[in-house]
Amino acid sequence: MSVKIGNIDVGDFPLLLAPMEDVSDPPFRALCKEYGADVMYTEFISSEGLIRDAVKSTQKLDIYDSERPIGIQIFGNEISSMKQATEICAREKPEIIDINYGCPVKKVANKGAGAGILKDIPKMISMTKEIVKSTDIPVTVKTRLGWDEHTKYIVEVAERLQDVGIKAISIHGRTRKQMYKGEADWTLIGEVKNNPRMKIPVFGNGDIDSPQKVKEVKNKYGVDGVMIGRGAIGYPWIFNEIKHFLKTNELLKKPNIKERVDVCRRHLKHSIIWKGEMTGIAEMKRHYSSYFKAIPNFKEYRTKMVTANSEDEVLRILDDVLLNFSNY
């Protein structure tokens, strides 16, 4: 049965690309869409940055028809600023406005934004209510289980967020205190999904790195779909691999070296076009190890790629990879 976020049909058991800072930009989103992602989210955008018209924030508003349905994700700690940012985002006509209540990094959380708001649930609910009231676009939330082990209130929080009008919730199976350490705990995500009061889609997130893992959480916890973050970095093929496995119970063959090099090269070129050579090359570095994961004796080439400082240099290294690893 198709899942709907408000009036947006996102298909049966949709796969969502997580909003990731300096990762979920248009070049990477285009690849993920090509390889099977159903719903895109922008990198998270500072509400204050949007209001100030800061270039770093406004550039993240760039969305394209080819990647729809797409959500623009915002974060902040002031209700008035978040409402104003929502109005700015609405001009770009995204299908979804997503609120980040999950970012655990200190510079965000210590200001009471992102996962920081998990220490002030009444404010979280009030902020969400005001954002929902300020737009006709479906509003969704991405959050965590709680601030720490003693404040895992996600079952109640999800109900209250639904009551003020959100149209879907994505839950990362860790607390803010955990950051990304340890294993994601999906049991509470399952409790939210199986709470008879919950009527909106519940998407799970955390440690989704294989088709087998997706099948496990789908069957065990009944989630409406999954949001994939780190598992997609440098590996956009994961979306089609998951879809194929859920449909056939068979694993797709991993991309060969030519496919990996071709997609990596395209990703690099689009990143440079979009962000300029220096930034494009710098932000590609986090992708290289995953593009060429599990290839023996690759360390030398990976080191060369992450230390390269020009497009021509990286492209020459990729040519060498294609030549020297043609059997993979």
In which residue ranges do the predicted regions lie?
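Flavin-dependent oxidoreductase catalytic cores
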Residues: 1-328
